[in-house]
Amino acid sequence: MAVKTINVNKDILGVNEALALNLKKAFEINNTFVINLMAAPGAGKTSTILRLIENLSADFKIGVIEGDIASDVDSRKIQERNVDVVQINTDGACHLDANMITAACSGLGIEGKDLVIIENVGNLVCPAEFNLGENIKMMILSVPEGHDKPLKYPLMFTESQALLINKVDLTPYTDFNMDEFQKTVRAMNPGIKMFPVSAKTGDGFSELTEWIGQQIKAAKKMNGSSK
């Protein structure tokens, strides 16, 4: 008698995909644009969110879902900006999944929100595998991490629709090769939109903010909303 083998990873991803589809429908009904923000620890996810809140909150109602293995340090920073935020602590899991986001949305209340930013757990591998019902996957690569990261961690670079190259103000102090980096990424993902930025100084955020605003408005128009 043959031994039956079960592909656990495939089953998990299948269940997640079904839940993510339900989330996507809910977001569309509410005309809520969702960004799944992914990066390694320390790349500048929370700093980027704070900049986006500063630049976008005058025109759009924003909510944030914070994902961390432990603590609510980042959520408190968001809360200080008078933005609705829900904290997810995964207690060891290296990524968020659609089930976690479903629960978080109940606490956040997506009704009336134009934009929800999901800060995924700091990791360059697992988060890219799990659909959260988002409109776009946006990743951050910070200059100190090195220009070779697309070759070492290709999945996130190929799955993302937008890439922020953060901490460009530190470029003179590293051997980061911007041209080589962008060439590598373009070969892997020709359609990706890249933004060299500094969350610390604000450089590059005008273009990024304008682009996100355009994406939000385009999604609303596609959903038949004039709001």
Give the positions of each predicted feature:
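Iron-sulfur (Fe-S) cluster-binding modules
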Residues: 1-15, 19-22, 170, 200, ...
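Nucleotide-state-sensitive switch-loop elements of NTP-binding domains
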Residues: 3-38, 43, 47, 52-135, ...
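Active-site glycine-centered loops adjacent to acidic/histidine catalytic or metal-binding residues
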Residues: 68, 166, 198
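Residues at the C-termini of beta-strands that transition into short coil/loop
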Residues: 89, 141, 198
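A short, terminal or domain-edge coil/loop segment
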Residues: 116-126, 140-149, 171-175, 216-227
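Conserved C-terminal guanine-recognition region of P-loop GTPase G domains, centered on the G4
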Residues: 127-134, 143-191
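Canonical P-loop GTPase G-domain recognition
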Residues: 170-225
